[in-house]
Design a protein with these regions (language model features):
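Conserved beta-alpha junction segments in alpha/beta enzyme cores
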Residues: 37-251, 255-281, 291, 298-514
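Signal peptide processing junction and immediate N-terminal pro/mature segment
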Residues: 32-36
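Bacterial N-terminal signal peptides
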Residues: 18-31
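Residue-level detector of alpha-helix boundary/anchor positions
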Residues: 3-6, 29, 111, 209
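Composition-driven detection of intrinsically disordered, low-complexity segments
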Residues: 7, 17-20, 86
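N-terminal secretory signal peptides that target proteins for export/translocation
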Residues: 1-14
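Charged, flexible cofactor/metal-binding loops and thiol motifs
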Residues: 284
Length: 514
């Protein structure tokens, strides 16, 4: 019996020990699972303003780095207040490779896991400090030295008041870009305008104590410079507003979208000083409305896929240039001799448009001539109107000629660039990054907005956003309907029209892997 009782006792102990062991293993399993899903992040920014830049500098330009690390994956998001990542502006063509190489050397992070986006800032963004590579590495280093566990949240805001489409669609089926390099067409020739992307994509990273570490926000629109000041553009003002209204030390990183044909409103306004600050404040406030409604969660997976795809180079430059030169010749032949010069045209034009019924004198003189059976003033008016119409026709022809001349020059530059490459395709790096529910896909060009809207509509992820000007620069990437339109984007492009479908299909394929 003693043996029997002892056996029972041991059996109970064994069961108890097994239960404890099972609970311990369950706890360990949960701990490991949680750890694998726990994201760590560090963020920093470094001033890259060029002190020698001309003009009145009212605020600073920055390079900002966000280092992300999960159990098996590391990634870095870098944003630069510059016009482009190589190609144009003061960031050299080897900037991307130099930064990635140093990151690999110092942190051991795969170069393909580094995403660098330029805000496409004009003005000061064309001429940042000369040691921008070193300062970029400094920002990454500082961010990596201050990594903390973070909660992750994603969402979107809405801002449709500060941008408009760059291209005017004309009644003749052509396109005309709103630019300071050329005048706008007559109002009666304009049929419609294209779309914008009002969505503000947001990634929110909070520390475990509830304080916000970083806000990544994505928006679409050219940040042109103000007329009298050199600033960070609307992204600079929006970032400043976000940082001041979040936890102390929060850093806001702006990621430029597909804004190849999206510009700020009132871009050609001649009656007021162009100022980016009101636009930035509106964007910042709209972003804050969305940020406050995002509730970060403890887990957030980190994935990044980088691929290089081959896209066809454009081959119709000669045809396009010949077509524009033919149009030039036709416009030249349309010019007519005229009695007026600008000195006589301007007062006549004003006079005959304000006082249409009696432009040459007070009405009683016209009435007196009628009583006398004469029509001298009417004949004078008819002659003056013919002169005005002829002069106006010459002006419109001159405006179109100057635009054609500029576009022909652009097309010839891109033709030379493609021919010197010596191959029919161009290698393009694209990325897809997923942080929690935040998904970002990239392209290294000034992509037309419709392409981004298409990608968002087809994505299986709710919070999918697009970044142009990322990891390189190959000029413009118009949407398929803009090829042959005659707009600025049509001529400043290295790619064949097939590029859009190839890219969109590839992105759809990559998104399925995320």
């Amino acid at each position: 019996m003693k043996i029997f009782r002892h056996t029972i006792t041991n059996t109970k102990s064994t069961k108890l020990m097994c239960s404890v062991l099972l609970l311990s293993l369950t706890y360990l399993t949960l701990t490991v699972t949680t750890a694998s899903a726990q994201l760590r992040a560090g963020v920093a920014k470094v001033n890259i303003t060029n002190p020698d830049i001309k003009g009145n500098i009212t605020d600073s330009l920055f390079v900002k780095a966000l280092v992300l690390k999960s159990q098996n994956t590391s990634a870095i998001i870098i944003t630069v207040d510059a016009v482009a990542i190589g190609g144009i502006g003061s960031l050299k063509d080897n900037y991307l490779s130099e930064v990635r190489s140093r990151v690999k050397e110092e942190l051991g992070i795969d170069p393909q896991n580094v995403l660098i986006n330029a805000s496409h800032l004009h003005g000061a963004g064309y001429n940042v400090c000369q040691d921008v590579e070193a300062r970029t590495i400094q920002a990454v280093r500082l961010a990596s030295q201050n990594m903390v566990p973070v909660n992750v949240g994603a969402g979107s805001g809405y801002e449709d008041r500060i941008t408009e489409n760059h291209i005017l669609k004309l009644k003749n089926g052509k396109g005309w870009a709103i630019r300071h390099a050329n005048p706008l067409p007559p109002d009666e020739e304009i049929e419609s305008i294209g779309p914008i992307d009002p969505e503000i994509g947001i990634l929110r990273l909070d520390k475990k104590n509830g304080e916000t570490l970083a806000i990544v926000y994505n928006f679409t629109g050219h940040p042109y410079q103000s007329i009298s000041e050199e600033t960070g553009g609307y992204p600079g003002f929006a970032s400043k507003l976000i940082e001041k209204n979040m936890s102390e030390g929060t850093i806001a990183l702006f990621i430029q979208g597909f804004c190849g044909d999206v510009i700020p409103i009132l871009y050609k306004d001649v009656h007021s000083v162009r100022d980016q600050e009101p636009l930035g404040i509106m964007l910042g406030m709209s972003a804050m409305d969305a940020i406050r409604n995002i509730k970060p969660v403890r887990t957030g997976d980190l994935k990044i896929i980088t691929e290089v795809i081959k896209l066809p180079r454009r081959t119709d430059f000669a045809e396009r240039i010949a077509s524009m030169e033919k149009e030039q010749e036709e416009l030249l032949r349309s010019l007519r001799s005229t009695s007026l010069n600008f000195k006589t045209f301007l007062p006549l034009y004003i006079q005959y448009n304000i006082f249409k019924e009696y432009p040459s004198y007070y009405s009683h003189r016209y009435l007196r001539e009628r009583d006398l059976g004469r029509n001298d003033l009417k004949k004078l008016d008819e002659e003056n109107r013919r002169h005005i119409a002829k002069y106006l026709q010459n002006i419109y022809a001159m405006e179109k000629l100057s635009r054609l001349q500029y576009n022909i020059g652009l097309a010839k530059e891109r033709e030379i660039e493609n021919e010197s490459a010596g191959e029919s395709t161009i290698d393009v790096e694209i990325q897809a990054l997923k942080v929690g529910d935040f998904v970002l896909v990239t392209f290294p060009a000034e992509v037309s907005v419709q392409v981004g809207l298409n990608i968002k509509n087809k994505s299986p992820f709710k919070n999918t956003f697009v970044a142009g000007y990322t990891n390189g620069y190959i000029h413009y990437a118009p949407s398929i309907d803009q090829f042959g339109s005659g707009a600025y984007q049509d001529h400043n492009c290295l790619l064949g029209s097939e590029w859009q479908k190839i890219y969109e299909d590839k992105i759809s394929e990559i998104l399925k892997k995320l």
